[in-house]
């Protein structure tokens, strides 16, 4: 009898110990199952990590953009100060400044903004083709170009320009520049302009009038592309006849007027600072294939 009681107590004790040992194991197994099913706690932890990660990236991008824009502003200031110190007719200094500003605009604002500011399409295209870093940064922008019908037409125009640009030497003087520009436009089927010389001469005449502000030039339907072309040839001619100080003063006035023109042009067309629609040849109205 006593042996039976002893065996019964031994059996109950062993069963209780098994329960005590297996309980943590069962809890561990349940936790593993819940985590595999995607419990709320696991998703909350993952979501908070993702939020911290993306928030840091957004803040870093904003800080980088502010830094780049401050660099661009500093570059303009340094360029103006450098031009004031020029004591000889150095048009190369102007071109050097223009190229530096162009590179910064391409990097910070993109190709569309550079075109809207009056930089020649071939300059933009060449920069995209030969500068690997900018090409990588603007990869998304270029993809947008190819998908957008309006900008796709612009890319087609650049290809046509590139074809005849290879066979024509750059202009060496104002008269050669006018002929060069006119011949180029005539070779474009979509822009068969017959009076490019007249338009360019009228533009230079308007820019020569110091009383006309940038806003007044916008009211005369002057586009950034034609403005930039005329200003380029004006600068070359002025550099031949003006002293260093006179040329610096002339250039600073032109820079201020061009800045006013760009702001007024943007306001007139209701263009945002970025991703603006382009009207490079806004001065031309085509009627029956003839530009007027």
UniProtKB/Swiss-Prot annotation:
CC per GO annotation: extracellular region; host cell cytoplasm; host cell nucleus
Compartmental location: Secreted; Host cytoplasm; Host nucleus
Chief place where the protein resides: secreted
Superkingdom to which the source organism belongs: Eukaryota
Secreted among keywords: yes
Location of the motif RxLR-dEER: 49-64
Induction field: Expression is up-regulated in spores.
Signal peptide range: 1-20
Cited function: Secreted effector that suppresses pattern-triggered immunity (PTI) in plant host.
Family of the protein in this entry: Belongs to the RxLR effector family.
Entry note about domains: The RxLR-dEER motif acts to carry the protein into the host cell cytoplasm through binding to cell surface phosphatidylinositol-3-phosphate.
Protein name per the record: Secreted RxLR effector protein RXLR-C19
Lineage of origin: Eukaryota, Sar, Stramenopiles, Oomycota, Peronosporales
């Amino acid at each position: 009898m006593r042996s039976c009681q002893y065996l019964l107590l031994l059996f109950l004790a062993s069963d209780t110990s098994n329960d005590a040992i297996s309980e943590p194991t069962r809890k561990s197994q349940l936790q593993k199952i819940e985590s595999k099913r995607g419990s709320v706690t696991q998703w909350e932890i993952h979501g908070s990590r993702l939020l911290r990660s993306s928030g840091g990236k957004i803040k870093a991008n904003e800080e980088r953009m502010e830094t780049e824009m401050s660099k661009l502003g500093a570059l303009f200031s340094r360029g103006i100060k450098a031009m004031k110190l020029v004591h000889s007719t150095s048009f190369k200094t102007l071109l050097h400044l223009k190229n530096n500003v162009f590179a910064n605009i391409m990097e910070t604002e993109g190709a569309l903004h550079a075109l809207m500011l009056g930089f020649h399409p071939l300059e933009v295209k060449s920069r995209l083709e030969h500068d690997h870093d900018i090409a990588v940064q603007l990869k998304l922008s270029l993809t947008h170009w190819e998908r957008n019908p309006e900008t796709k037409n612009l890319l087609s125009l650049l290809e046509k320009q590139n074809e005849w640009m290879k066979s024509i030497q750059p202009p060496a003087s104002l008269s050669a520049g006018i002929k060069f520009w006119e011949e180029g436009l005539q070779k474009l089927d979509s822009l068969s302009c017959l009076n490019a010389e007249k338009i360019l001469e009228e533009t230079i005449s308007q820019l020569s009038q110091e009383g006309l502000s940038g806003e007044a030039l916008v009211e005369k339907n002057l586009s950034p592309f034609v403005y930039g072309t005329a200003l380029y040839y004006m600068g070359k001619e002025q550099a031949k006849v003006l002293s260093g100080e006179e040329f610096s003063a002339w250039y600073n006035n032109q820079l201020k007027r061009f800045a006013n023109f760009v702001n007024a042009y943007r306001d007139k067309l209701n263009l945002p600072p970025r991703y603006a629609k382009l009207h490079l040849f806004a001065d031309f109205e085509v009627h029956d294939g003839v530009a007027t």
